[in-house]
Amino acid sequence: MQLVPTDDPDEKIGRTSNGMQNATLPIDGPVNTEPKDPAREQWSGKLDFLLSVVGFAVDLGNIWRFPYLCFKNGGGVFLIPYSIMVLLTGVPLFYMELCLGQYYRKGAITTWGRICPLFKGIGYCVILTAFYVDFFYNVILAWGLHYLYTSFSFNLPWASCNNSYNSPACYEPHWSEDGTAMCRSANQSVSAEKISAAEEYFYKGFLGLHEANAPNSHVIRSVTDLGNVRWDIALSLFVVYLICYFSMWKGIHTSGKVVWFTALFPYVVLGILFIRGVTLPGWQNGIEYYLRPNFEMLKRPSVWQDAATQVFFSLGPGFGVLMAYSSYNDFHNNVYVDALFTSFINCATSFLSGFVIFSVLGYMSCKSGKPIEAVAQEGPGLVFVVYPEALSTMPYAPFWSVLFFLMLMTLGLDSSFGGSEAIITGLSDEFPILKKNREVFVGCLFAFYMVIGIAMCTEGGILIMEWLIIYGTTWGLLIAVFCEAMVIAYIYGLRQFVHDVKEMMGFRPGNYWKFCWSCAAPFILLSMITSNFINYQALTYQDYTYPTAANVIGIIFALSGASFIPLVGIYKFVNARGNTISEKWQRVTMPYRKRPNQTEYIPIPTTQPHSDIML
């Protein structure tokens, strides 16, 4: 064999006379990944990285989704399937993505192109998923910002029924004259036909989704009739993007400092709100309801599905964020400890936030005389209706309201930073011209978000948001992460991946991690994908049913990100060098790595069998 140049300067490698690569490296052979990359910026400190990852993973879902899922799925017993899913899928995939980003030191697109060119489409899929999430996530932050600056008032607008949009069905919760709160008995409960001032403010006064002055909660908008733009929401969204831009335009050196506040401040507020919550009447009932175990619920597949879904959306594999953040680490950073630490913080925050939420729900049940299941809500209804209503009944209500919505803003901002950084890093590494003009690129990205976001600033904007939440994330995310696990286990090879980890940190992951990466995670992910397809239902929101066309377009939209995986794979295969299918397959399934004293990434096969798992 002799070394001959190829037409592609990035593919200089030994070849036989038929043009096929004939060089192989033993698994512990001299592959140099050039850990010192002077052109790659790095975190200015280890804590910048840890706080950025914690800030991304701990988001609004920890506050408004996990506690509700515990309540819905058997109370404390939900922690059993949740913990199992964390141990078998969440943490292993979290760890895997951090390792891949740190080893290849690039964003998702370039990293997957180097791991396995045939599956470079995984990188495009995860970037597109992060793109879809950013469309609606920052609108929720705009809502929080509106509530935050509106809270700087002696009279909170969601505490009163004296507004122009209020209906005769509106009621105001009150404290007693001596400053204490008395619990209502069942026969004193608020009528189910009544609508709280907080609910009317959110849906009628703020969003305009429900008809003003009407004594009901019927949706009056549709996806074909979104109504007028709510310019106060649009202005808030513009301010959110200004905050994001000036936090991210210079890269991780600016965002890495901002997260010192946005990642740590929520824990201060959660502690304060917990102390306040356990001083309210009825708090014990709320906590008991949150933790009361119902072991019969473990027999329901939906409980396990909810646990797995929460793990993936909470820890965040498949969004490209973990790869992007870890790509700025020192090559020999102990990402194993980082993965365990940040995963634990995330899961503990989810669990502890339940005490903050349900102590207040117990209080609301006490105040209204309604059972807790009639008070509890999931998603925006919890943080923009139920919790603000509870805070409005307390002495010094504006103070508590400012504190709560400032916490929501900080929780959401660093998660927004993560999603945007995944896109910026992924595209900048793949298209270097964007990296050279980062400030302009980031500005154009957020300007595009702002234009798209206007549709969700209309009176029916929440209908578009719900459509994006359902169709823009779940299927593409699950398919991408499933492909990630399968490629690492069965094409790239676990033995090679384990060697890469050893090269970085000096030790090999044990059999537990190999089992999770090769068996447990792919099986659970495939089960989730199958379940999502089998149990698919046409989308509804409150009493509004989405038209058939919206659901059909939604399904196409849901699969748009995942479609990049086969499309890019076909393109790579068709254009691969080689005279036979076997030669082309070898070309597109070999990882691109570096030899000693070379700067180019070249395709280098290994001698290890791809199916060799437990080694």
Curated annotation (Swiss-Prot):
What segment(s) does the record annotate as region Disordered?
1-39
The disruption phenotype is: Significantly reduces the learned avoidance of bacteria that induce mitochondrial stress.
Q: Which GO terms describe its cellular component?
A: axolemma; axon; dendrite membrane; neuronal cell body membrane; plasma membrane; presynaptic membrane; synaptic membrane
Keywords assigned by UniProt, alphabetized: Cell membrane, Disulfide bond, Glycoprotein, Membrane, Metal-binding, Neurotransmitter transport, Sodium, Symport, Transmembrane, Transmembrane helix, Transport
Q: Which residues bind Na(+) 1?
A: G55, V58, L411, D414, S415
How does this protein lie in the membrane?
Multi-pass membrane protein
What is the annotated role of this protein in its UniProt record?
A: Dopamine transporter. Terminates the action of dopamine by its high affinity sodium-dependent reuptake into presynaptic terminals. Plays a role in the learned avoidance behavior of animals exposed to food that induces mitochondrial stress.
Tell me the protein's name.
Sodium-dependent dopamine transporter
Q: List the gene name.
A: dat-1
